[in-house]
Every structure is written in C-alpha cells, then in structure tokens.
Amino acid sequence: MVNVLINGYGSIGKRVADAVAKQDDMKVIGVTKTKPDFEARMAVEKGYKLFAAIPERKHLFEEAGIPVEGTLDDIIEDADIVVDGAPKKIGKANLENVYKKHGVKAIIQGGEKAGDAQDSFNSLWSYNRCYGKDYIRLVSCNTTGLCRSMYAINSVADILKARIVLIRRAADPNDVKTGPVNAIVPNPVSVPSHHGPDVVSVIPELDGKIMTSAVIVPTTLMHMHSIMVETSGTNRDEIIDALAKTPRILTLKASEGFDSTAKIIEYARDLGRSRYDLNEIAVWEESVNVVDNEVYMMQAIHQESDVIPENVDCIRAMLEMESDNLKSIEKTNKAMGLIK
C-alpha cells in the first residue's frame, strides 16, 4: 500500500483523490487547499486529512472552522508520491521548489510544458518509459483522448498523417471567469495548435505526421475532435473493432440518441457517475469512415475526467507497482467502475 498526497484539491485533485481511494494498493494520506472554501470543507467531510498548501494561510482554515491537520510541509515526507493538482504554471514551481527539495516523486498535470518533467505519460503509449521515473507530466485531457484514438488506429495500420480539428469547450461548468459566451474563437489562431506537439511528446513516432488546429466554442460540457488520419491501409470494420478493443474508448450511436455532447453527459448522469464524469472518451460510430485508406471519425472528451484513471496508472508506473500497463489499466478501471 503506497501513500499518495494530493497537492491541490480542485477540479483534477478531488477526482484523483476519489480514484486513488478506490484502489486496493494505494491510499490518500492527505489533500491540500490554498483557501478555506466549500471544497476544503467537503474534503474533510469525506474523510480526507486536510493540510494547508501555504503555511501562512493555515490560520484561515482554523478561523473558518475547517479542521486542518497541519501544512504541506508536515505531510509531504510521509508521501511516496505527490499528485499535483495546482493551476497552470504552479505545478512547475511546485516541482522545482517543493517536490525536488523534499526528494519525493511527483506527477504534474497537462497545463505544464513537456520539458518541465522527465517524460509525458499516457497509459497506452508511455507507461514503460515512465516506469520508475521521479517526475512525470500527465498530459492534458485533449492529448489523452487523441492518444487513445491514435492507439486504436495504430493497432490495425501505420499512421502516415494525422489531421485533427479540436472544438474546445469554453470553460468548465464551475468557471464564471472564462469565455466566450457568444463567439467562436480560434485558439490559437496559428496552426498548428499546441496539441499536435503535445501528442508527439507521448508518441515520438508521430513527429512530423500530426497537424492540429483548435477553436473554442460557448459550451461547458465536453471537447470534440474531428479526426482525419491517412494510414497504410485499413477499412471501417477494422477501425470499429480496434476502437472496441481499446481501453477507455466507448463507441456510441447517434441512432440510439447520442446525437450531441449533451446526450453523452446525460448518459454519464444516468450511469450514476460522480460529478457526471465520463473517464472514457466517446466516439460516434456513424462518424467512423474510411476512404482511400484515410480514417475519419469524431470523438467527445469530458475535459474534467478522462485523465483521472491515467493518474492512477502513472502512480503505479512511477512506483514500479505493476510492470504491465494493460494489467494496471484493467485494475484501475475495475476499481473505478469504468465500462472498459
């Protein structure tokens, strides 16, 4: 049983905490918050030991009547690994100023740059490369989703060229500061977007073979990808079969009512998923087509949750708990109640 510390109990951190708590080979020894908000109070109510991420703010929790066990410095030495859930750029600072200082292994999230850690993690592609490493970046929700679909395609044909248009959600549901509300925004306006190089950080063999562009649209539910991949040769049946065999990919039919991201989220609600999380990505079966060996398909990504099981697998890889990535994936999925 390994000890996991969650530094930053926010959108990602609280989900990773719940996922780790469901595993039988790891436990959450504590979570941190920078301020005494409702998430901090709920963490304590759920049974997590709460620590102040910033020592100077410990008194704020006490004044708010939220029990704290101490500060980050009081618990970090007990951790075998830290999962950093801090906002963009803060993760890198934590890595340099906290985790390396204390000599503790750490996972930073996809908001940081590839060069900030020893490698970039995806359960299907880079598990072995990250095995036993000390500092790893868990790639973003979009990159995670693309890595899964590229894995499926690559399992039946060589990828010659990949072109992806990303239609990104404007903000998470709890975000009142980000937009747009009434616009479509090229983000970035230049091509390629950062997503292609980010995929290459996980799949080096796609260097020079992947091109991405991205726009932001006024929705909060999910991202969507329109994928076009030139291959060495395949057909629709092979791709459908490959998607069915690839972990954490669901193939859904518009003919059964899955005609929008709203319906996919409703499906997650009906499954009883906490926070309506869909850790699996969803590919519309009707969108899958192959013309002259070029694969076309559309997929939806729940931006708050598809990276969560990857964090659990990354813990196992870095702490050398399981050498077989597929066994770790299966173990994680079963504990979290994933469909596949």
From Swiss-Prot:
Name the family: Belongs to the glyceraldehyde-3-phosphate dehydrogenase family.
Catalytic residue list: C141 (nucleophile)
CDD domains for this protein: GAPDH_II_C (cd18127), GAPDH_II_N (cd02278)
Localization (cell): Cytoplasm
GO BP term, example: glycolytic process
Which residues does the annotation say bind NAD(+)?
Answer: S11, I12, G111, R169, Q303
| Name listed for the protein in its UniProt record | Glyceraldehyde-3-phosphate dehydrogenase
Q: What Pfam family does this protein match (any one)?
A: DapB_N
Q: Which organism is the protein's source?
A: Methanococcus maripaludis (strain C6 / ATCC BAA-1332)
Q: What do we know about how this protein assembles, alone or with others?
A: Homotetramer.
The answer to keyword Oxidoreductase applying to this record is yes
* Catalytic activity from the UniProt record: D-glyceraldehyde 3-phosphate + phosphate + NADP(+) = (2R)-3-phospho-glyceroyl phosphate + NADPH + H(+); D-glyceraldehyde 3-phosphate + phosphate + NAD(+) = (2R)-3-phospho-glyceroyl phosphate + NADH + H(+)
Which leading EC class covers this enzyme? oxidoreductase
**Pathway given in the UniProt record:** Carbohydrate degradation; glycolysis; pyruvate from D-glyceraldehyde 3-phosphate: step 1/5
Which amino acid positions bind D-glyceraldehyde 3-phosphate, per UniProt?
A: S140, C141, N142, H195, G196
